[in-house]
């Protein structure tokens, strides 16, 4: 009986080693094409959320099969809806939700509306309102305004900053807009 076990142990170890190698082959790094596809699908799912608007900002990072969600939202349910939508995408195994829910504040709500009117009421900026969700997002936290997203030109970026900075009750304006050269 001892000789059978002596031969069986190395054979078992060999099979376990081969199975581990096959499993590791199945866990390859995602290809660049699959990463680009995932990025496009994540963006699509986020912008299609029903309550996503100009006062919310989503950012995300795709790393392999993990998606990290970041940004700011005005409604708590939008944070959870974003996570649910991204989890349903084929190829996403894990979602880290780092989205900040902005505090409720009547003063911040007033500033949001005033900054929106100041930016999008300008004759040079009206074309941005033709989009379902304008590309310049207005984030207000405790009286501080953050402009996020994209502007078509450097002039639009600067004009948005000047308009937001001229609103009464705004403590500061941080212009995080990038110029979209497409």
Feature roles, as predicted:
Residues 2-10, 14-182:
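N-terminal targeting leaders
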């Amino acid at each position: 009986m001892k000789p059978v076990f002596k031969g069986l142990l190395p054979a078992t170890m060999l099979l376990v080693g081969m199975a581990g190698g096959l499993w590791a082959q199945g866990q390859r790094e995602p290809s660049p094409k699959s990463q680009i596809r995932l990025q496009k699908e994540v963006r699509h799912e986020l912008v299609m959320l029903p309550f996503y608007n100009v006062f919310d900002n989503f950012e995300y990072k795709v790393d392999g099969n993990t998606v990290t969600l970041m940004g700011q939202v005005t409604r708590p349910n939008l944070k959870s809806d974003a996570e649910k939508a991204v989890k349903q995408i084929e190829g996403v195994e894990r979602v880290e939700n780092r989205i900040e829910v902005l505090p409720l504040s009547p003063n911040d709500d007033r500033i949001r509306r005033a900054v929106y009117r100041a930016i999008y009421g300008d004759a040079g900026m009206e074309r941005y309102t033709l989009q379902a969700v304008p590309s310049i997002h207005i984030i207000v936290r405790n009286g501080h305004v953050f402009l996020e997203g994209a502007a078509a030109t450097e002039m639009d970026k600067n004009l948005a900053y000047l308009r937001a900075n001229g609103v009464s009750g705004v403590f500061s304006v941080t212009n995080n807009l990038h110029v979209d050269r497409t």
